[in-house]
Amino acid sequence: MNKILHKRIISLLLVLLLAISCISCNARTNQETLQSRFDTFMEEMFVQKVQSDSLSLNYSLARPEQYGITMTEATFGRCSIESMNEGYSFTENQLSRLLSYDYDSLSEDQKLTYDIVKDYLRTDLSLGDYNYYYECLGPTTGIQAQLPILLAEYSFHDKDDIKEYLRLLPRIYDYFEEIIQFEREKSREGLFMSDAVAKKIIAQCEAFIADPGSNFLITYFNDKISRYSNLSKKEIASYQAQNTEIVLTRVIPAYQMLIVALQELLGTGTNDAGLFYYPQGQKYYECLAKYKTGSGKNMEEIIAMLDAAIGGGIADITTLTLSDPKIIDKYMDFRSFPITDPEAILQDLKTDIREDFPGTEEVKCEFKYVPASLADYLSPAMYLVPPIDSYQNNDIYINGSDEKTLSMIYTTVAHEGYPGHMYQCVYFRSQNPAPVRSVMNFTGYDEGWATYVEMYSYQYAGIDKNLADFLRANNIVILCLYARADIGIHYEGWDKNTAMKYVMNYISDATIAETIYHTLLEEPAIYLPYAVGYLEIEGLKKKAELILDKKFVTKDFHRFLLDIGPAPFETIENYMDLWMKNESK
């Protein structure tokens, strides 16, 4: 009897174990299925993003066919209220789909992607109530200013890319027509730009098309295509002729059309001051600041952070002045960094950063110079982000090849090259992150990192240490001053006199102060990603130093920031708390 009972108990236990095993197996299978579905969703989001226009696709992927992507229509995308509303509806749908996933069932990497994408989508949606406040034109970052460089650097991986480029280029006329219609609608809403900004854009367009036969998009294409090894002379001549005709009959007329339209709209703007003076301008600026910086701080906290940084920088300058009586003379006499050739600077930095920055794979970098027709309107330098599947070839544009420009180019190369944008981009791409992360725009992280390492690079420049510290502190003060005045103008409603008075507390030259005022007025929040992003990273570093104490290693902190990649700073801080727990063990 006992034997029979014993056998029954054993049988029952076996059945129970088998049932538990099946449940466990099913749970594991369900989790794997969910994770697979999540990866598919992220891939779909990536494909939808890069397929939105031909430039995005070309700059994102060298071989789109490997992702199953084909562009049936060459397009610059859309710029209309209808397309914006459609975009926000689509974003709402994507956010809803994202939130439907069980967070706890995702892998650790997927959780990071989830956190980042969720914040990105929510921030994007926050701008949806202010469509007419959006401005696609602008003296420095406007599409009409950026487009020539973006078109010139359109990648030709094979003949199909050349053909696609020549299909895309004439569409610029239709694209500008849509932009003009949008600007007319802004005018009717009382939200058109000031005359000063419009006149500056007009002058910029006029300079770009001043010499049609020698236009940058003709001369650069001719040189670029002639060096393409897989073409016959006949093909080269044919492509050059097609491009020249398109530039002369579609591109230049598009810019002429834009000039005429802006001239017609002169006088229809209702506000010559900051965004604050538009009906919803302050709220829009608040959303814009969050989008541009990736900071979770409110405006009052950002103001306090900037004020503290300015005060700290001035204190550092004062301390240096007291400890080194010759520091002002050193500063006034400073004319050049020891190395002035951009390629030599890049090589110097690649060697110098090894102690404090993790290694990454070797890539090629070509320095190019902004054409004269665009020089007065573009940034001092720019790094063109390469496709995610071809990041081994990189381009950095420098605005000016004269001796004066190059004499001060050292820290700019650090910002754009090593250990700045190019280094960060190559490092992140080499980690093989989810492709969708490469098309999420986190300017605060990107420019914050580049500004942080730009300031860091003064120690590598080969100049007197006190002078290096003085230059760094001075540049931090100036950068934060610009950002603080930007907030004053657009969020707090400073008028011209108030803004200039504030700037002249630090810069005594009234002409320079007025130039700063107009620059900030023209493109709201333009300096916030640099200043706020930099201060957020400095804040993270100080927190890590405080908590880890003797276990803090600069190189490991940099590796953490690079590993996590572009993201909102609240997310980065949350993950840094976990990283510090592991580091402190």
Where would I find each of the regions flagged by the language model?
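C-terminal motif of bacterial Sec signal peptides marking the signal peptidase cleavage site
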Residues: 21-24
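N-terminal secretory signal peptides that target proteins for export/translocation
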Residues: 1-6
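N-terminal leader/targeting segments and the immediately adjacent pre-domain N-terminus
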Residues: 14, 26-29
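N-terminal maturation segment of proteins
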Residues: 28-585
